[in-house]
Amino acid sequence: MAYQLYRNTTLGNSLQESLDELIQTQQITPQLALQVLLQFDKAINTALANRVRNRVNFKGSLNTYRFCDNVWTFVLNDVEFREVTDLVKVDKVKIVACDGKNTGNAAE
């Protein structure tokens, strides 16, 4: 099973809403919707690992951190994100980072 972090993105939420609508109108079964979501999990993890090449630097004050079940969670305050010419400042950011070395086992 691949990480399901990206289901809570705009793309993931739109997919889930569309699948829910198809289930309600009985055009697909809940089992098929689950298979679609599992395929989405695999595809988005693979695409982000292999296709994204942009880099962003960020700096902020660490508020809290946690490591549980090979998942790091960081909460940062007063964060600055810098790309080549852009600067974005935000009050608070939560970063969830999963062990990429274990995704081979998780993606089956």
UniProtKB/Swiss-Prot annotation:
One of its GO terms (biological process) is transcription initiation at RNA polymerase II promoter. It is found in: Nucleus. TFIIA is a heterodimer of the large unprocessed subunit 1 and a small subunit gamma. It was originally believed to be a heterotrimer of an alpha, a beta and a gamma subunit. Interacts with NCOA6 general coactivator. TFIIA forms a complex with TBP. InterPro entries: TFIIA_a-hlx, TFIIA_b-brl, TFIIA_gsu, TFIIA_gsu_C, TFIIA_gsu_N. Pfam families: TFIIA_gamma_C, TFIIA_gamma_N. The keyword Kinase does not apply. One of its GO terms (cellular component) is transcription factor TFIIA complex. PANTHER family: TRANSCRIPTION INITIATION FACTOR IIA SUBUNIT 2. SUPFAM superfamilies: Transcription factor IIA (TFIIA), alpha-helical domain (SSF47396), Transcription factor IIA (TFIIA), beta-barrel domain (SSF50784). Belongs to the TFIIA subunit 2 family. The lineage of its organism: Eukaryota, Metazoa, Chordata, Craniata, Vertebrata. Keywords: Nucleus, Transcription, Transcription regulation. This is Transcription initiation factor IIA subunit 2. TFIIA is a component of the transcription machinery of RNA polymerase II and plays an important role in transcriptional activation. TFIIA in a complex with TBP mediates transcriptional activity.
